[in-house]
Curated annotation (Swiss-Prot):
Family the entry assigns: Belongs to the KptA/TPT1 family.
Catalytic activity: 2'-phospho-[ligated tRNA] + NAD(+) = mature tRNA + ADP-alpha-D-ribose 1'',2''-cyclic phosphate + nicotinamide
Descriptive protein name: tRNA 2'-phosphotransferase 1
InterPro entries, per the entry: Ptrans_KptA/Tpt1 (IPR002745), RNA_2'-PTrans_C (IPR042081), RNA_2'-PTrans_N (IPR042080)
Keywords (A to Z) from UniProt: Acetylation, NAD, Transferase, tRNA processing
Taxonomy, superkingdom: Eukaryota
Length: 249
């Protein structure tokens, strides 16, 4: 519809996308502060990972957010990344990340999974093509975090809340009972993510891989064979600039 003078009149814009962007911004800021940056930011983190929410909101990057904003993100986060709980009168509300820490959190609420029967029937790690050759040769690494993250199913499976990204390209299925037999510990976080520190070097070795599955663009089994075959499993070929064919490594 044209407004007088020939200018086009736009319809009313909804504020919902802006609100969603704001919630994503807050969720990312919370994830960094509570998983990785608490010490750098001067936050008083307890041994169980909780920090006073009021102390968090006093940081410059949180000045535009309120307690209600945080409560909304905590309550609506699909992966249930955070927990809020009442604290002492002197501290008020407390908040923590349920998993994903690079910080040492010695008393994080984790349930030990000490027998094969305690483990989920499916243990799977999601990754991307660029990491697959290295994973197939060396195993899964916890890298800078305290644990390797596993899920009890693939993205979209019933009951799978967190532990695997929906855009993962490769799924690696783990033989949990075999790893337990070798002394590899497993835990379950408050939001259902299965966690393991791996071996002494922080790896879950390829000997514990049961199978692997390409998830994108279509699902199909992947070989767990050695070096030469690994080179052919670098994902779908993509056209690069100038018309050359390029394989993601």
């Amino acid at each position: 519809m044209n407004a007088p003078g020939g200018r086009r009149k736009e319809g009313r814009r909804t504020h919902r996308p802006r609100e969603q962007d704001r919630n994503v911004q807050l969720s990312k800021a919370l994830s960094y502060a509570l998983r990785h940056g608490a010490l750098k930011l001067g936050l008083p983190m307890r041994a169980d990972g909780f920090v006073p929410l009021q102390a968090l909101l006093q940081l410059p990057q949180f000045h535009s957010f309120s307690i209600e904003d945080v409560q909304l993100v905590v309550n609506t986060n699909e992966k249930q990344r955070f927990t809020l709980q009442p604290g002492e009168p002197s501290t008020g509300l407390l908040i923590r990340a349920n998993q994903g820490h690079s910080l040492q959190v010695p008393e994080l609420e984790l349930t030990p999974l000490e027998t094969p029967q305690a483990l989920p029937l499916t243990l799977v790690h999601g990754t991307f093509w660029k990491h697959w050759p290295s994973i197939l040769l060396k195993g899964l690494s916890r890298q800078g975090r305290t644990h390797i993250h596993l899920a009890s199913g693939l993205p979209g499976d019933p009951g799978v809340i967190s532990g695997i990204r929906p855009n993962c390209e490769v799924a690696v299925f783990i033989d949990g009972p075999l790893a337990l037999t070798d002394g590899i510990p497993f835990f379950c976080s408050a939001n259902g993510v299965i966690l393991t520190p791996g071996n002494a070097e922080g790896f879950l070795l390829p000997k514990y891989f049961k199978e692997a599955l390409q998830l994108r663009p279509t699902r199909k089994p992947l070989s767990l064979a050695g070096d030469k075959e690994t080179e052919t499993q670098s994902g779908p070929k993509l056209s690069s600039r100038g018309g050359r064919r390029k394989i993601q490594q």
